[in-house]
Amino acid sequence: MKSLPFPSPSRDLAGDSAQSLLLAARLHAPGSYLGIHSVPGGELVRVFQPYMSRVWLQTSSGFQVMECTHDAGIFEWKGEAVTRPYLLRLEHAETGVIEERYDPYAFPVQISGHDLYLFNEGRLLQAYHMLGTHQVKNQGVTGTRFAVWAPNAERVSVVGDFNHWDGRVCPMMARDHSGVWELFIPDLPGGTLYKYEIRNHSTGEILLKTDPYATRYELRPNNAALTPVESRYEWQDNDWMVQRAGWDWLHAPVNIYELHVGSWKRHPDGSFYSYQELADHLIPYLQEMGYSHVELLPISEHPLDESWGYQVTGYFAATSRYGNPEAFMYFVDKCHQAGIGVILDWVPAHFPQDSFSLARFDGTALYEHEDPRLGYHQDWGTYIFNYGRSEVKSFLLSSAHYWLSVFHIDGLRVDAVASMLYLDYSRKEGEWLPNRFGGRENLDAIDFLRELNTMVHGEFSGALTFAEESTSWPAVSRPTYLGGLGFSMKWNMGWMNDTLNYMQLDPIHRHYHHNELTFNQLYAYTENFILPLSHDEVVHGKKSLLDKMSGDVWQMFANLRLLFTYQMTCPGKKINFMGNEFAQGREWRVNHELDWYLLERDPHRGIQMLLRNLNHLYLDTPALHELDFFTEGFSWIDCHDSEQSVISYQRRARDGSFMLVILNFTPVPRTGYRVGVPESRTYQEVFNSDSTYYGGSNIGNPGDIVPTGQQWSGQVDSIIITLPPLAGIILI
C-alpha cells in the first residue's frame, strides 16, 4: 500500500480544536479525531500513544511507520484504503519492548439503540448484559467492551495499568443522548484492573470511579473493578431448579438459617473461609440441623467489613473476600444439590458515600436525589436511590435479575423496606418533602417495589421475596394486581418485638403482659409472615438471645428452649440467626467467628439438640407448616390463662391432622393441669423442651394421656397433664 503525503492536522477532519481537547483530556467524541477517516486522496489513520516511541500500521504492504505529528504522542498515516480493523505495532518508549495490538478506534460501537431506549425508559431488566464489561468479538477480534452511564460527563475514559491510568488514552464514545458511553478495547485479558475517569461537563471536576455494573472487584481496601473472565462453570442443579419451579411454597416448610459468611467460622489464623470451604462445612451442618434455606447477609461487594455488607458498592459482584464468582456459583450449586435453598440479603434502599462508587457518580446526583431531604439517609449516613429515575430503576431491577439468573439464587430478602416507603422515615417536620399529593408515601419507591416483585415472580418461578418492613403498611405480601406490594412474605417484626419483650420479663410479672403472647393472632393472617430472630437482635448492646432471657442460668436456658418451642410452633415461616441455635453467649461480633467452643458445655449442646429436633419436627409435620398463612391452621385452646402464664393452641394440616401445643411461661411445674382437646382419644407427648436431653428437669407426660370425658375451653373433651417449668410440650 502506497503512503501519501500528510495533510496538515489543522486542515483534516477534526483539526486543531479536537487535538487540543484530546491532549487536555476533554475530547467528548474521540471517534471524530482518532481512528480512520476519509480524506482527499485516501484515508487517514490517527492514534494517540503517549507512551510509545514509534508506531507502525499494518497495511497490505506490511507494517509501515506512522509519522509522529505531535510530540505528546499523536501518530498519523495517510494512504490508500486501510483494512478494517487494523493492527498497530508499538515500541514502548521506556523499555523498547515491541508489541502488536489493534486500535480501539478501529471498531464500531455495538450496543443497540433499542437497548439504550429500554434502559432510558427503565425497562431494561437485564442491563448487566449491556453496561459494565463483557468479553465479546467485534469484527472477528476478541476484546472487552466497556459501557457506563454518565449523562453529565464531558468525557469518560477507561483507565488501568494497561494505559498508565491516563485518562487521555482511552476516551469512550458517547452514545447519542442516552448518557451511555462505550468503548471496545481489543486483546485486553480477563482480570485486568480498570476504573472510569470522568470529567464533569459543568465544573470540570475529575472523578475516578469504579464500574457500577462490574461483576468482579479487587480485594478490599482496593476498589478497582476487574475485566471479566469467561465463566466455565457447569451447573449441576437442574433437578432443584425444576422442583423449585413447581414448588407450593405457601404450604411448604420454610426454615431459614441467617448467616454472615465472614464470621460463621474462620481458620485458626483468623482468615476467612472461602466459598468452597463454606460449602464443604456449612451444608452438612444445615442438613443435620434441619434448615430448608440459608440466608446470606449481603455478599454484594462492599468496602468495610463492619458494615456487614449493607453498604454496597458492587451491586453485581459477589465479594472477593471469599473467592471469585465461579466459587460462589459452586456454593449455591452444592446447596441446591443438597436440597438447601439460598437467599440473599439485597439492599436497594440506600448506598454509601464512598467517593469511588455510586455517590455523585458523574459529578452530579445521578443515582441519588440532589435534595438531601429526599436523597440522604440521616440514620446511616448514606444516599437514598432516586427510584423515579428510569435508569436507576433499570440498574436496581437488573441487579435483582442478575443474582437470580446468573447465580440461581432462590430469593431476595429486601432490606429496610420501611425506609423506602415513607418520605418522612426517621425525619422531623421540615426535614422531608411530601409527594405530589401532599402525602408521606414514597410513590416512586412503591412503584419500584411492585415492579421488582412482578419481575421476580414472573421470570423466576418459585423464587421468593421477603420484606423487612417494620410498620403497619398494608398488603406488603399481597399480589400487585390486588393493590399489594407483591412480596412473598413479610418479616413479622411485631411478633419478634412482643415476644422478646415478654421473654425478658421476670416470670412473676408475665401475667400482666399476657397480651404480648396473644395479640399477634389478631393480625397474623393479614400478611404472609415469617417469624424472625435475626442478627439485628443480637448486636449493638441488645445482648444475645440467651442473655436477654430472665432468671438464673438454669432459667435463662429454659426460657431460651421455651422461646424456640414457641417460635417453631407458631404460625409463620421461620428464620434464626447463626449462633442462636447453640445459645451464643456474647453478642455477634463481625470480626470473630462464633463461639463454637461453647458446644463443649452441656447446656449449649442441649439448646442445639433441641432446635435440631424442633427443626426436623417442623419440616416433617404438615400441621406445623402447611397452613402457616391461613386461619384454618391455628386455633386457640386457651389464651386466657394469664394468671398462670400458660397458653395452649392447636396447629392443623390440610388433611385435618393436628398437634396440640401447651406452653408454660413460669418456673412453676403444674400438675393436674386440664387442657381442652378437639377429639376424644388418647394423646402422646412427642416433644418436651424440659427433657434432660436438652438440659431440662425431665418433668413431663410419659405414656398415653387419656381423655376425661369432660368438655373444657369450648372443646369436646379434655385431658389432665403435667406442665414442666419454663417449657413447652407438643402432643399428638
Swiss-Prot record:
GO MF annotations, alphabetized: 1,4-alpha-glucan branching enzyme activity; cation binding; hydrolase activity, hydrolyzing O-glycosyl compounds
Residue runs in coiled coils: none
Keywords for the protein's UniProt record, in alphabetical order: Carbohydrate metabolism, Glycogen biosynthesis, Glycogen metabolism, Glycosyltransferase, Transferase
Active site per UniProt: 415 (nucleophile), 468 (proton donor)
Enzyme Commission number(s) of this protein: 2.4.1.18
Presence of the UniProt keyword Transferase in the record: yes
Free-text function comment from the UniProt entry: Catalyzes the formation of the alpha-1,6-glucosidic linkages in glycogen by scission of a 1,4-alpha-linked oligosaccharide from growing alpha-1,4-glucan chains and the subsequent attachment of the oligosaccharide to the alpha-1,6 position.
Complex formation: Monomer.
Protein name: 1,4-alpha-glucan branching enzyme GlgB
Gene expressing this chain: glgB
